[in-house]
Amino acid sequence: AVDGRQIFIEPWGNTALIGTTDDDTYADLDDLPVTTDEVRYLVEGVEQVVPRVREARIVGTTVGARPTLYKYGPTEDALSREHEIVDHAKDGARGLYSLLGGKLASYRMFAQEAADLIAPKLGNHAPCTTHSSPLPGGDRPADIDLLAARFELSRFAVERLVTRHGSRAETILADSGRRGRMVVCSHEPVLACEVRWAAKHEYARTLLDVARRTNLAMGACGGNDCALAGAVIAGEELGWSPGEVRAQAAELLRSRQRSRLPAIGDKQARAEAMTMAALRTLGR
């Protein structure tokens, strides 16, 4: 990057992820902002090695809060990514523990350390098996070509399904008929049976939940081609009324629009908002 920090470019399905930035935040964790300056910072950094990067279209931005261990003075990127378990017995609160810091790459080790500390205090002295237990769908490899032929799907569609669900992809497909194998979002792609699976087995209760589990609307279409279709399918499983189906689709579209606004800049974002307001007025 322009200030010497590292930037990563990672392939992700039909797109590439570019990141990351670090900044202190005091915002609502349910509504964290992405700034235009952060987008420009990343694009300028990548431009040094990919000169034509500005010709690519930014389809969205993503943000999250990382609970790094606090230390006064260092810049955000210099803060430790280590984790720590605090026993609050010393504060007079026996049985209360805080898990601080850490990151996604070490979450299972962090969980094992917490279990090894707390379980014996509850009378459970069995050894922790987290380190040897496969994640859901990670018990065995899936044969993509065999699944594509068996269920009459494109290899790409099956490959993306396996990427998201591993060996569970076969179960998801086997539970569906031909209608269930319909492609809902062609940019990812996401199948109808995958939307149903998220609602039935993965505790999805909103269309945004479905999107987070399947990548519905997260690609180039931004939900324009698939939000309503996805809402109809999820609604059949979750018992939504027609009005709730429309409301869920609208909320997903609003979410995807918010993720794109930092990429087009503040002034253009305001112009887009004015255009949308004018269109709504004309449509009345």
PLM regions and their residue ranges:
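Small/polar glycine-rich anion-binding or flexible loop at a beta-alpha turn
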Residues: 212-217, 227-229, 250-251
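Low-complexity, small/polar and acidic-rich linker and loop segments
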Residues: 240-284
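Alpha-helical interaction/regulatory segments in DNA maintenance proteins
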Residues: 222-240
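C-terminal catalytic lobe of FAD-dependent flavoproteins
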Residues: 1-19, 23-222, 234-235
